[in-house]
């Protein structure tokens, strides 16, 4: 998740921030990324934030949240093919990257979903490929480290269907064969959500044993690119996301991992924006804790897709314009409210919890541009402000 445009306002003096390791001082402003990053992956180890891949190719960067004045530091390049939408999480002081999608080789005719896994060691500043394969496609999935050292993974596109669709699309010249191209797209995009066979298991990877397991099935429709926030040890909030290409859900679910199993509970949906604009849900939103609340910001959707799906038109986003949202919501554990606005519509960037707010890193704007900007959404439970 990641972005912002326009002139940076200078902070007067130096703001005091209390991070998990104690009180630290923020620089005059949060440093921009060296390059714009969208559809990338991110993780955090202590006070080090890591962001890369996606539109940055194999680039990988780190920011010391205790000393942001040092800026983003280039780390070792990712050693796999450039990938979008990888699931990434930290465990045992290392960072693990699973799946994603991209071209296996530069001359490949079409992208695929990868079934590979890699680990980054900050101590040696090096990547290694793991001797394992993901059980299913995990592009668009969310990964999170658990207290026992394992990594839980939610959602993910179906590799078999995704790979075949993109190969078939790549084999047709849509200018010379427009009818065949349209028929293929309509056939794939017109399926009901269940037909996409997205990952409906809560997978768990154990770095110590280099093996995979399951924490149980998701009782809801599996989704991809949801917003995710850690609520407490073993407690995670999954908000919105896609339930099929082009169609989001406004639902939010609380997942509690206890005694080797994932326990799901539906909580309040994202609220309607107004009486005339129903909640479409969002994919690629930014999320994290801000004090006692969870903030969910930005994301992208297609206005009108929910109405189309309700009418049985399952190619729900056909002919609709994609919208990059600037809405920010706050969740107090029971109810949602509209907290304010981002400086602009943004999606598919990175977010990190910070005292007093949510650090928003990069992302994609309404023009599809990968953004460099980094800013803090400050929230005191009543008012939202932006610290650049």
From Swiss-Prot:
Tagged with keyword Repeat: yes
Main location per the UniProt record: periplasm
Cystine pairs: none
Repeat region (Kelch), residues: 48-92, 94-147, 149-186, 187-232, 236-285, 307-356, 358-387
GO terms, molecular function: racemase and epimerase activity, acting on carbohydrates and derivatives
Signal peptide: 1-26
Gene3D superfamilies: Kelch-type beta propeller
Origin superkingdom: Bacteria
UniProt-listed InterPro entries: Kelch-typ_b-propeller, NANM, NanM_proteobact
UniProtKB keywords: Carbohydrate metabolism, Isomerase, Kelch repeat, Periplasm, Repeat, Signal
Protein location: Periplasm
A GO CC term assigned to this protein in UniProt: periplasmic space
Keyword field contains Signal: yes
Positions annotated as active site in the UniProt record: 242
Function in brief: Converts alpha-N-acetylneuranimic acid (Neu5Ac) to the beta-anomer, accelerating the equilibrium between the alpha- and beta-anomers. Probably facilitates sialidase-negative bacteria to compete successfully for limited amounts of extracellular Neu5Ac, which is likely taken up in the beta-anomer. In addition, the rapid removal of sialic acid from solution might be advantageous to the bacterium to damp down host responses.
Assembly description: Homodimer.
PANTHER family with a match to the protein in the record: KELCH-LIKE PROTEIN 32, LD33804P
HAMAP family with a match to the protein in the record: NanM
Entry similarity comment: Belongs to the NanM family.
Official protein name in the record: N-acetylneuraminate epimerase
Organism: Brucella ovis (strain ATCC 25840 / 63/290 / NCTC 10512)
């Amino acid at each position: 998740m990641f972005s912002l445009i326009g002139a940076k306002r200078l902070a007067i003096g130096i703001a005091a921030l209390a991070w998990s390791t104690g009180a630290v001082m923020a620089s005059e402003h949060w440093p921009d990324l060296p390059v714009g990053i969208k559809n990338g992956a991110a993780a955090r180890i202590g006070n080090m934030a890591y962001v890369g891949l996606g539109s940055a190719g194999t680039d990988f960067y780190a920011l010391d949240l205790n000393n942001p004045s040092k800026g983003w530091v280039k780390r070792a390049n990712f050693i796999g093919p450039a990938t979008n939408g990888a699931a990434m999480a930290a465990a045992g002081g290392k960072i693990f990257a699973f799946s994603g999608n991209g071209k296996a080789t530069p001359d490949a005719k079409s992208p695929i979903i990868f079934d590979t896994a890699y680990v980054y060691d900050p101590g040696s500043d090096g990547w290694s490929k793991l001797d394992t394969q993901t059980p299913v496609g995990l592009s668009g999935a969310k990964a999170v480290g658990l207290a026992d050292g394992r990594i839980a993974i939610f959602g993910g596109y179906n590799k078999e269907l995704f790979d075949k669709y993109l190969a078939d699309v790549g084999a047709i010249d849509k200018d010379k064969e427009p009818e065949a191209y349209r028929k293929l797209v309509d056939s794939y995009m017109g399926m009901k959500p269940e037909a996409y066979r997205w990952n409906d298991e809560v997978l768990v990877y154990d770095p110590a044993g280099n093996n995979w397991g399951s924490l149980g099935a998701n009782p809801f429709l599996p989704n991809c690119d949801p917003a995710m926030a850690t609520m407490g040890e073993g407690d995670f909030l999954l908000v919105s996301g896609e339930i099929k290409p082009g169609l989001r859900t406004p639902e939010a679910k609380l997942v509690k991992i206890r005694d080797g199993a994932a326990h799901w509970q539906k909580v309040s949906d994202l609220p309607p924006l107004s009486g005339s604009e129903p909640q479409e849900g969002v994919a690629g939103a930014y999320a994290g804790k801000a004090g006692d609340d969870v903030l969910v910001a930005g994301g992208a959707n297609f206005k009108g897709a929910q109405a189309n799906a309700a009418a049985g038109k399952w190619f729900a986003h056909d002919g609709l314009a994609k919208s990059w949202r600037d809405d920010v919501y706050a969740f107090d554990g029971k109810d949602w409210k509209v907290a304010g606005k981002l400086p602009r519509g943004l999606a598919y960037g990175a977010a990190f919890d910070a005292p007093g707010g949510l650090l928003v890193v990069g992302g994609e704007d309404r023009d599809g541009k990968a953004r460099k900007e980094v800013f803090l959404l400050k929230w005191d439970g009543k008012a939202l402000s932006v610290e650049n």
